[in-house]
Amino acid sequence: MSRPSHTSWLVVSILALVCVIAFAQTQPPQRSIQPGPDRKPGEGEGPFERLVIRGATMIDGAGAPPMGPVDIVIENNRIKEVRSVGFPKVAIKESGRPAKGVKEIDATGMYVMPGFVDCHAHIGGVAQGTPAEYVYKLWMAHGVTTIRDPGSGNGVDWTLNERERSAKNQIVAPRIFVYVRPGMGWDKGRVTTPELAREYVRWAKQKGADGFKIIGEESLFDPEIMSALLDEAKKLQMGTTTHMSQTGVARTNVIQAARMGMGSMEHWYGLPESLFADRVVQDFPLDYNYNDESHRFGQAGRLWKQAAPPGSKKWNDVMDELIKLNFTIDPTFTIYEASRDLMRAMRAEWHDRYTLPSLWKFYQPSREAHGSYWFYWTTQDEVE
């Protein structure tokens, strides 16, 4: 049998490629995880016309030390009264306690505190194989009662729907604030002009989004486009935050964005760049490639050494200005702890019971899975 010619193989390859492209166009990849299941009987109660939590030790979350016993009165989902009702290890006099509630919880010997608000909380992801139920229950079990999903990676409509289901107590989940990435969800494509930025903000407001996460596309870090988006968001009383990717931070860093009206930042990207005293661009190694996440995260950690040192005039000036601008920093420290001590993070005792197998698989060393850059991670990386 004669050997196929190079031209024949090329034709076959092109036809195969066309078939793959056609299939991809008719079979879009799954982009959303399984939503939270409907609330089942016995999964939570309320809200109640009048709920009284009795005999708890309270941590108020505002810096005060623990205090108790206290009775807490909640009416129609709002705290109406917190009353000190006695002394530790002494019988409580009933005459000094608030009136009975429709529902009462005996919290004797327990602590009560406000729910945690997680401002950087992604509701799972298809690649990680995490259904919403798994994520919600982890949050609720750890006392997280409100989350902000920066980017709404499962889609605008999906995340808005989960927010409404949570608000109606149809699912077991925290309260959800929906922050979308400019350009996602609508039919006009990327945001590449100030006019499109303003139009997208108005579109997102009409959809019901709570705010915006600026990340990724370089056009969004164009000062004119970012300024227009922030201005329109402010007019419509919508929130804003940014993940200052290395791909755009040289055009606009955190202090510059804050001056335009940015409300907060995710992680810490863009902050050391705001503290540069002798450069504009970070000192990248000659072989640096942003798509290699061991480069991306390894050099990001070293970036602080290129910034003005703590306590210096530059450092204090930036800090003081951010405070004056009422700018919020959401540093997400815990995820970066693994970069300082990988083996400790991998062998945490709770993995065996609580880490979903698909999630464990995703975070094995990989050149493709985001945040799994351990394929060449050394002691030098951890120390520096």
Question: Where are the regions that the model predicts?
Answer:
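Bacterial N-terminal signal peptides
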Residues: 11-22
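Divalent metal-dependent hydrolysis catalytic cores, especially in the metallo-beta-lactamase
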Residues: 135-156, 173-184, 206-219, 238-241, ...
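Bacterial N-terminal signal peptides that target proteins for export
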Residues: 1-13
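Histidine-rich, glycine-flanked metal-binding segment
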Residues: 34-39, 43-47, 58, 64-113
